[in-house]
């Protein structure tokens, strides 16, 4: 059985998903490693684009091996990726109920459920889960960054958000998304000059990410570097045009910034204007 699992895993790592799926299916249902094989088969199905079949495999596994937290958490991950956030939350609920109070993985479950709540629009439940994850793993950079960035986007608790993101950067200094968050919270706080270096570093780390390039454009605009801002906004648009990248960047808003400038866009949105004298 170990040889079958090893072979299937190797085939999957080589992108031979159909062959991997076939090998995973050779593990008998009465074998103690059956759930491992089925989790592998579901992953191979998902990676081959067969999300619905992957979900079917995992749902069947919840019926045959429902006492295992990993089965429910994996189902939650796939449902969340499929944007079935309500279903993902239910799966994570079950995983959290089953996981030992002392299990190191519990923070991951709260973090994952927090993302599902956030994507479903429940900011209160989302924050509660992120804080539960931090209670278990206080310096986890992904959680610190996600919660900090969420608060920045909601324009609240900015000082706490800055502290969280600074801790995240200290723990993971080469993560472009986390460095971007630090630059962005400084921008939101009106500390534009301080934001420049962090945003430039984020673009170095994530050169083709449209959101990061858009953010750098906004920061450049705020410090009076209009031509460089327009260049970054055009870069952001070009990376969005190259494919169906899942991104929070709004191409229409970027085009409007290119047409009338960031100040005018903020005014039309009823958002706070950029601060004058921002070296604070």
Language-model segment annotations:
Residues 9, 43, 77, 115, ...:
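Residue-level recognition of tetratricopeptide repeat
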Residues 30, 63-65, 98-102, 136, ...:
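Structural marker of alpha-solenoid helical repeat scaffolds
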């Amino acid at each position: 059985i170990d040889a079958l699992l090893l072979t299937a895993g190797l085939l999957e790592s080589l992108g031979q998903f159909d062959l991997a799926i076939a090998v995973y299916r050779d593990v008998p249902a009465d074998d103690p490693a059956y759930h491992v094989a089925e989790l592998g088969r579901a992953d191979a199905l998902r990676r081959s684009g067969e999300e619905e079949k992957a979900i079917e495999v995992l749902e069947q596994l919840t019926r045959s091996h429902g006492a295992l937290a990993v089965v429910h958490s994996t189902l939650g991950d796939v449902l969340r990726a499929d944007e079935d956030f309500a279903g993902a939350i239910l799966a994570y609920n079950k995983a959290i109920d089953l996981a030992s109070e002392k299990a190191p993985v519990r923070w991951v479950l709260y973090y994952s459920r927090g993302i599902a709540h956030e994507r479903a629009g429940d900011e209160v439940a989302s924050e509660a889960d992120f804080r539960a994850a931090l209670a278990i793993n206080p310096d986890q950079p992904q959680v610190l960054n996600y919660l900090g960035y969420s608060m920045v986007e909601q324009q609240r608790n900015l000082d706490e958000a800055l502290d969280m993101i600074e801790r995240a950067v200290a723990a993971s200094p080469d993560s472009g998304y986390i460095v971007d968050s630090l630059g962005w919270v400084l921008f939101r706080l009106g500390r534009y000059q301080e934001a420049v270096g962090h945003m430039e570093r984020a673009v170095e780390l994530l050169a083709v990410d449209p959101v990061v390039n858009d953010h750098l454009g906004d920061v450049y605009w705020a410090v009076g570097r209009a031509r460089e801002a327009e260049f970054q906004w055009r870069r952001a648009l070009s990376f969005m045009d190259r494919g169906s990248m899942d991104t929070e960047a709004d191409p229409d808003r970027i085009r409007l910034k290119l047409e009338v400038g960031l100040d005018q866009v903020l005014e039309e949105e009823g958002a706070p204007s950029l601060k004058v004298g921002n070296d604070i």
